Amino acid sequence: MSSFNRRTLLTLPLALPAVLAACGFTPAYGPAGPAQGLQGRIRAADPGDKDGFDFVTAVEARFGRSKDPRYALAYAITTEAVGVGFATDTTITRYNLKGRVDWSLTDTESDTRIAGGTAENFTSWSATSATVAAVAAEQDAAKRLMVILADQIAAEILAASVRFSP
């Protein structure tokens, strides 16, 4: 026989905030959170191509469009399409789009690098015999990849904001 107590189970979610507060947890965007000062303060470098445009759009979706930028985000994007699915006649039926972003966040007031690194990921798309559909699928995969990479970088910036938030 188990001594399962439903009341104890139901009160656990109520105790969670107290447990998190006791360990020093502060929401990143909370009133005293370290990332609160990042909204509208990060300016990504101007994009030079479609991938860059999609990447900057995704970064601005996370941190807001820069109104009074204190931090400059420099980045270099590289992508490579690789055939991964093959039919019996050796035609490619599926592609992976591998992407890499080398990035650096600089405090423009002190001109010091405060965070940086490399984000890598991939997306896939199926090849089709219709040219328009194939191009649309490839463009969609590229856009999804830029959003994924921007999310990875945003998470790293949020984690690092404890060290440099104003």
Features from the language model and the residues they span:
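Acidic, proline/glycine-rich low-complexity intrinsically disordered segments
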Residues: 2, 44-46, 51, 61, ...
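N-terminal export signals
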Residues: 8-25
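Bacterial Sec signal peptide processing site at the extreme N-terminus
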Residues: 20-39
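Flexible, low-complexity charged segments
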Residues: 24-28, 50, 164-165
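Post-signal peptide N-terminal segment of mature Sec-exported envelope proteins
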Residues: 33-55
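Surface-exposed short loop/turn segments
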Residues: 66-116, 124-140, 151
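C-terminal/domain-edge helix-coil "capping" segments
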Residues: 136-166
